[in-house]
């Protein structure tokens, strides 16, 4: 289990190690990222690495947590506005635009980690599941607000709709990555809008 440092310099060192590992995993994948690679990128000693992380799996759990935090931070502003049709359209447009900026490479950082760590490390799987839970909760909160304002039908299930939206986006992100075509995500986004419009009161 990773150790949380008590001093500011210790916290900075641990964060530098996690950031280096997160960058390397995004660039090369988990299998191609060694602890020596991380130490070199982070300018950290072996003793510093093992002071905060018991082994490689422990570090990858921290990478999973860090990745989820970063994904939520990037979309925090647009997700907070996911409570009107206009806000939802802006959120979806921003999500597609980000993939266009990345030339349809990388996919969803959380989703990309799932296949690499979830089947052999329960701690990492739980960290990634928590990231998706937080994402889904943000979507659900906006939909609940729309139901309360009678912008969506009273029989709308915000929890189910949020799950459908997240699943659609993840599928779109995966197809965008493998086909190198952001139009895949745009098709998923259009499907999300159709789902929401079907629940509108007017």
Model-predicted regions and their roles:
Residues 111, 138, 156-175, 191-194:
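Hydrophobic alpha-helical segments that form the core
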Residues 16, 20-58, 62:
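Helix-turn-helix
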Residues 87, 102-123:
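Amphipathic alpha-helical segments used for helix-helix packing
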Residues 120-126, 133-161, 198-202:
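Hydrophobic alpha-helical bundle segments that form small-molecule/ligand-binding pockets
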Residues 62, 76-107, 158-165:
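Hydrophobic alpha-helical connector segments
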Residues 1-12, 202:
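N-terminal intrinsically disordered/low-complexity leader segments
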Residues 65-71:
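Short, basic, alpha-helical segments at the C-terminal edge of helix-turn-helix-like DNA-binding modules
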Residues 98-101, 145, 166-183, 195-202:
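Amphipathic C-terminal alpha-helical segment
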